[in-house]
């Protein structure tokens, strides 16, 4: 998402800091701000408001919203179709800013939230791609809960709204995508679990009332959005050509889970077209799927300026009024930008849309604010009204940010047990690389102001004596300065090299062309490793995968870590892992391809499945059969683990009616509807043993290879569970598998099926055949 001026996040951050700096100068170092929340139905100031039904908390949300909408003029309704919603002072309704962000902490990207001397920063967690690498579903929700608490605290002092356009749950199908760092990775199940978990953490109230919201989350960008700016192809004009099979099998599941399992309050439609239609003007996608099939309880919002884009950039309509009408009629409720505010009234006057459709849109918007308590009067007298500055950047929240980074960091190589290092034995540690002393780079994009930074250098220096040489002036590394780096590595007991990317390499509106280490970083790593006296640990800071084949095969580079963008406490977490205060348990949530893959595969090809006729290799671990640098799920530990199958069936019989067509013909699959799918499930019991001495968490993956029908995936993830095991201990892990849901696949027409025949279940090195028969 960009602003209404279609700016990039880098520019936005510059502008935010410029404004903050200017304000500091003018105010003598302090930023003044209001210290109370904005809200409607302030009966203390205006007792007459108590007579309005929409201010009556005893009525249902539906009754209150209907009472409000019937009192509004057309102009007032139109003014509430945009993110900077107008006030209706005659009814005691203040203006409201819908646009706030909370991708991995409360952000000041977006006009709804800002920091001040009252609350100068908020906890900045790792980017979602690293959180997802933890494969810890409870962590996803816990982080969301902390973020929403800090958001409510900021709202109570007038620094934030209640509606947050997060998370980003698009599938990370191509490593070049600049926004892949914002997502939970390439797997539909993982992305679905992340979406539902994070949304629940943000939204759920302590009393468990699903009609109330702590804050309102928003799953974006719907749908098949994962090209920003690649070789001149821009998101504003890109038409994603997607088969129905890929749409329902890969791109849609996270959004479906977000709405159905997470009960999200909002979905954001994207800039791009899907099969020739702008997503924000496609009634099949909005009214048909989100509201019709999935039953969204909330509002649908456009990405910023998306309606303007479909008119001006995509030329989808002849007039702006027609664009406004088509979007609202398709199911859009709120426009990030001013387009609907400028052209909707004209669309009504031209007969392109009726006022009843406007009523439906504002109903969905106001119903969300009702559920948030915006119309319930003074927030200080409501649940969460006691939250304030004391509840932001708490020591517990900052420790959770550190723990999230620790759980996500992935150990990809560890020759001869070179890690963990022994802090007592290391008398000198060389710390090298353009990201070795990174601070802002650790935060990623859609960031806020963190509570504090701990860079990798700072984290390591807190444990052992260090010497530092950047080796490159920046991550672009057009001119590596090798001498100082080689000198300190040659005399140090061990060397840590921190390389990778930052927002100059991969970001919103900036996709990569290649996936190699930028500039001369590879030369820096290789030459330093060649002269290093002790073990060499390579830490890669990035959102997308890198082709580091050279390091994987270089025996002088003894260990490789992927640290994502690890958030404010990233440096401390990296040090914890390197020195064994935390046993690494992260697993890659995406495939790391060789450069040769991206050389021959255009980013614009949305097909997931391979095409032997053209040589197209397919995408993600589910379909790609070629060479990888590292694979989805890769990651090692300082411990070793043993998996034993305790119990699992070898045969599942699907009960069919006597007159079912498949009883008299050779069906390859069955529809996942009907009585035969009800309560059709089985349990798998596994025993996991930690054979090492160190305590460690282990992610247990349950994969399935289905029968080769309907261009099925070669392998897909059915379930995962993260378990903590002390040294030499074991635990029983159980999975309940719903045959029609979990073993199901999508056919060429987008229909859900369960394949008949042999399914091969995988857990670690174990393989177990399961036959699904009639």
UniProtKB/Swiss-Prot annotation:
GO MF, any single term: xylan 1,4-beta-xylosidase activity
Active-site residues, record numbering mapped to chain: 303
Signal peptide: 1-33
Glycosylation sites recorded in the entry for this protein: 136, 437
SUPFAM superfamilies: (Trans)glycosidases, Beta-D-glucan exohydrolase, C-terminal domain
Entry keyword annotation includes Hydrolase: yes
Keyword terms: Carbohydrate metabolism, Extracellular matrix, Glycoprotein, Glycosidase, Hydrolase, Multifunctional enzyme, Polysaccharide degradation, Secreted, Signal, Xylan degradation
Its EC number(s): 3.2.1.37, 3.2.1.55
Keyword presence, Ribosomal protein: no
GO BP field: arabinan catabolic process; xylan catabolic process
One family name in Pfam for this protein: Glyco_hydro_3
Family: Belongs to the glycoside hydrolase 3 family.
Protein name, UniProt field: Beta-xylosidase/alpha-L-arabinofuranosidase 2
Gene that encodes the chain: Xyl2
């Amino acid at each position: 998402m960009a602003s209404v001026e279609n700016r990039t996040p880098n520019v936005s951050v510059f502008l935010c800091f410029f404004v903050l700096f200017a304000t500091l100068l003018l105010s003598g170092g302090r930023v003044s701000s209001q210290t109370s929340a904005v809200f409607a139905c302030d009966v203390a100031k205006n007792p007459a408001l108590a007579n309005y039904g929409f201010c009556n908390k005893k009525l249902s949300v539906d009754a209150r919203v209907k009472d409000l909408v019937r009192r509004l003029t057309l102009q007032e309704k139109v003014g509430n179709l945009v993110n900077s919603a107008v006030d209706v002072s005659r009814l005691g309704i203040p203006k409201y800013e819908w646009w706030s962000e909370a991708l991995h902490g409360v952000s000041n990207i977006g006009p709804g939230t800002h920091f001040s001397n009252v609350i100068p920063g908020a906890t900045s967690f790792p980017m979602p791609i690293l959180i997802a690498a933890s494969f810890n579903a409870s962590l996803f929700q816990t982080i969301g809960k902390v973020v929403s608490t800090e958001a409510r605290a900021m709202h109570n002092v007038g620094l934030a709204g209640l509606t947050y356009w997060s998370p980003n749950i698009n599938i990370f199908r191509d490593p070049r995508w600049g926004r892949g760092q914002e997502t939970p990775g390439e797997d539909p199940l993982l992305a679905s679990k992340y979406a539902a978990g994070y949304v629940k953490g943000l939204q759920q109230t302590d009393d468990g009332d699903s009609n109330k919201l702590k804050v309102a989350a928003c799953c974006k960008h719907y749908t098949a959005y994962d090209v920003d700016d690649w070789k001149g192809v821009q998101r504003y004009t890109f038409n994603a050509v997607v088969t129905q099979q890929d749409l329902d099998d890969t791109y849609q599941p996270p959004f479906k889970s977000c709405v159905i399992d997470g009960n999200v309050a909002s979905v954001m439609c994207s800039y791009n077209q899907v099969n020739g239609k702008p997503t924000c003007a496609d009634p099949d996608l909005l009214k048909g799927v989100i509201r019709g099939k999935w039953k969204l309880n909330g509002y649908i919002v456009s990405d910023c300026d998306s309606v303007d884009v479909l008119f001006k950039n995509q030329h989808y309509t002849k007039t702006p009024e027609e664009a406004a009408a088509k979007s609202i009629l398709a199911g859009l409720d709120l426009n990030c930008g001013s387009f609907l505010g400028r052209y909707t009234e004209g669309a009504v006057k031209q007969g392109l849309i009726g006022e009843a459709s406007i009523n439906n849109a504002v109903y969905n918007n106001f119903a969300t604010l009702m559920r948030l308590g915006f119309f319930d009067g003074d927030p200080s007298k409501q649940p969460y009204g006691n939250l304030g500055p004391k509840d932001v950047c708490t020591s517990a929240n900052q420790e959770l940010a550190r723990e999230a980074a620790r759980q996500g960091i992935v150990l990809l190589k560890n020759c001869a047990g070179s890690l963990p290092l022994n802090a007592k034995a290391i008398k000198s540690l060389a710390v090298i690389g353009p990201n070795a002393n990174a601070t802002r780079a650790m935060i990623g994009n859609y960031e806020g102001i963190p509570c504090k930074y701990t860079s990798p250098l700072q984290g390591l220096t807190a444990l052992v004596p260090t010497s530092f040489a950047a080796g490159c002036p920046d991550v672009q590394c057009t001119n590596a300065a090798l001498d100082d780096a080689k000198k300190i590595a040659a005399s140090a007991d061990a060397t840590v090299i921190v390389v990778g990317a930052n927002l100059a390499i991969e970001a919103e509106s900036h996709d990569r062309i290649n996936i190699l280490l930028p500039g001369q970083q590879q030369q820096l790593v290789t030459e330093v490793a060649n002269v290093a006296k002790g073990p060499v640990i390579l830490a890669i800071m990035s959102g997308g995968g890198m082709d580091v084949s050279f390091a994987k095969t270089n025996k002088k580079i003894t260990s490789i870590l992927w640290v994502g963008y690890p958030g404010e406490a990233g440096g401390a977490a990296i040090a914890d892992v390197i020195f064994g205060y935390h046993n690494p348990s992260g697993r890659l949530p995406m495939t790391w391809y060789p450069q040769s893959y991206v050389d021959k595969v255009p980013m614009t090809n949305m097909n997931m499945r391979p095409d032997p006729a053209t040589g197209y290799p397919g995408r993600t671990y589910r379909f790609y059969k070629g060479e990888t640098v590292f694979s989805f799920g890769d990651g090692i530990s300082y411990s070793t683990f043993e998996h034993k199958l305790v119990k699992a069936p070898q045969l599942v019989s699907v009960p069919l009616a006597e007159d079912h067509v498949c009883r008299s013909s050779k069906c390859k699959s069955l529809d996942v509807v009907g009585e035969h799918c009800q309560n059709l499930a089985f349990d798998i019991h596994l025993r996991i043993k930690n054979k090492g001495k160190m305590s460690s968490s282990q992610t247990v993956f349950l994969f399935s290879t289905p029968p080769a029908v309907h261009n099925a995936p070669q392998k897909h993830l059915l379930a995962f569970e993260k378990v903590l095991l002390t040294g030499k201990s074991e635990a029983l892990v159980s999975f309940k598998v719903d045959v029609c849901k979990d073993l199901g696949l999508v056919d060429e027409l987008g229909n859900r099926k369960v394949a008949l025949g042999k399914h091969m279940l995988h857990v670690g090195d174990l393989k177990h055949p399961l036959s699904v028969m009639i």
